[in-house]
Amino acid sequence: ATGMATGCASSGQESGKSKLVKIAVCVSDQTPAAKAMTDVFKPMVEEATNGKYDLQIYNSGVLGSEKVTYDYTKSGIVEVCVVGTSMWSETPKMAIPDFPFLFRDVEHARKSYQGELGTYIAQDLESTQPLKLLSWFPNGARAFSSNKKLESLDDFAGQKLRMPNNPIHVKLAESLGANVVIMD
């Protein structure tokens, strides 16, 4: 399972009387994380602040890749980002949620993120980066997609798989015998 984190920098642009808050979401607007941002987070913040903030959500990576939007958030170009594993290179503990078979199910992952594990990882991120971790989104189990049926471990041998630039995911696929093509 992969934890998706939302980070927040402190700068922003003014938009009329409301402060414009740009939120970069690298996944499709049809995913649970994007829907949570649009359907829950945005109205909750706007209502709780009486319109002080105008949250503009940019889904599907329109503001850039995870790494780009993470860097934008650190530099204040974007106020909030929803990203997966792009934070690892600078904060290695962010890799912990990516280990295979770490969580029994989504509820176990959620409790772990909201408990000691999530606090431990967030404190490390916040002590090394100019960010504040606002929330975790369990991203489900790792799945492999292929035009060829992958019904047994033998089916992975020589299978070309596109993978995110994530050493844990890549090593898992390679250990199954797949030929990995890294996507950035």
Residue ranges: model-predicted function:
Residues 46-53:
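Short helix-capping segments at alpha-helix termini
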Residues 27-31, 57-60, 108-110, 158-159:
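Second-shell loop/turn segments in exported
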Residues 39-46, 79, 84-183:
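Contiguous mixed-secondary-structure segments that line small-molecule binding/active-site clefts
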Residues 65-84:
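Periplasmic binding protein-like
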Residues 22-39, 60-64:
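Extracytoplasmic "Venus flytrap"
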Residues 57-71, 164-168, 181-184:
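Short helix-initiation/N-cap motifs at beta->coil->alpha
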Residues 1-20:
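Short, low-complexity disordered leader/linker segments with a strong preference
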Residues 22-24, 56, 81, 162:
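Short, well-ordered beta-strand segments
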